[in-house]
Amino acid sequence: MNNPVIVDCIRTPMGRSKGGVFKNKRAEDLSAHLMKGLLDRNPAVDPASIDDIYWGCVQQTLEQGFNVARNAALLAGIPHSVPAVTVNRLCGSSMQALHDAARAIMTGAGDTYLIGGVEHMGHVPMTHGNDFHPGLATSIAQAAGSMGLTAEYLATLHGISREQQDEFAYRSHQRAQAATVEGRFRREILAMEGHAADGSLILVEDDEVIRPETTVEGLSKLRPVFNPASGTVTAGTSSALSDGASAMLVMSEAKAKELGLPIRARIKAMAVAGCDPSIMGYGPVPASKKALAQAGITIDDLGVVELNEAFAAQSLPVMKDLGLMDVVDEKVNLNGGAIALGHPLGCSGSRISTSLIHLMEDKNVRYGLATMCIGLGQGIATVFERVQD
């Protein structure tokens, strides 16, 4: 069986969804920029040799509709002979795109794939056009369709306090800001043009979403947004709304070596799992356990972990039940997470995987885990193994 490997991985800066730097850029622009960027950075790869493009996106309508993957590929100037498909597993879409490419390589269907994902939440809101079947009320709780209420329920079940959530959100912003100031994001961000508040053209090199002025005291004053009467989840402890894309060049190990390309990491194991939709944020626990078992390693073998921070109220129970609470500051979301950077739905799976691989290199560790929850009760996880000299 062929080994799927990561040759390169990049992302755009994360822009604020409300009047942010990408307000005049479309989802296809963000995606095409990264597709072109990966090929420019790896000239040994003949664009015509790409077997397929898998691109995650959740709200596949308006500018993100009609197979945004193909639209972006055409915009990027990729040969017309190269196919492209848009993948949707809600929040896990671009990680699913990675899994699809990895399996294609493992089965010998191809050697070279571009994968990634995008979401322009400023142009296509998360709830745009949503229309749940009324019959779902007979099999799941009515509130299961509200991600914020599922986070509230998870916090209640696991005894997660408002104070713990505020502390975790503060940590996310502080770590993301430190990573920005110290240049730790520079290797994973591919700068691109955007627009300042006055409409002038600028080069966007850093994430716009991080709020370095965040304090625990300030967070403590915010009102609960999903359950105003007795809730604990606030806008400040939820993932920020942002616009962004991420991308990876995935190849068979044999093809990468043949072309003399660097092998950044091997895909060691992949898993998805379901859980009660009422606690959708718990999905990373069964998915991660499944992936670790497939990899033949334990949670203690992991050097770094990237957990998508949908909500602090969701992240804390996951870390608790995965046995990570005692090593959070040594292993988990070391450069902050989605509370600070945002969670552009279709982008996040390959975004956290990209951040993870760069951290694995920085920390010189062998194994890393990227995992995330998925709306309506799913989780997805990938174990990466760094190729060490």
Swiss-Prot record:
Pathway assigned to this chain's UniProt record: Lipid metabolism; fatty acid beta-oxidation
Family stated for the protein in its record: Belongs to the thiolase-like superfamily. Thiolase family.
GO molecular function: acetyl-CoA C-acyltransferase activity
Principal location: cytoplasm
Gene Ontology CC annotations of this record: cytoplasm
InterPro entries: FadA, Thiolase, Thiolase-like, Thiolase-like_sf_Thiolase, Thiolase_acyl_enz_int_AS, Thiolase_AS, Thiolase_C, Thiolase_CS
Xref: CDD domains: thiolase
Protein name per its UniProtKB record: 3-ketoacyl-CoA thiolase
Gene responsible for this protein: fadA
Highest taxon in the source lineage: Bacteria
Annotated Gene3D superfamilies: 3.40.47.10
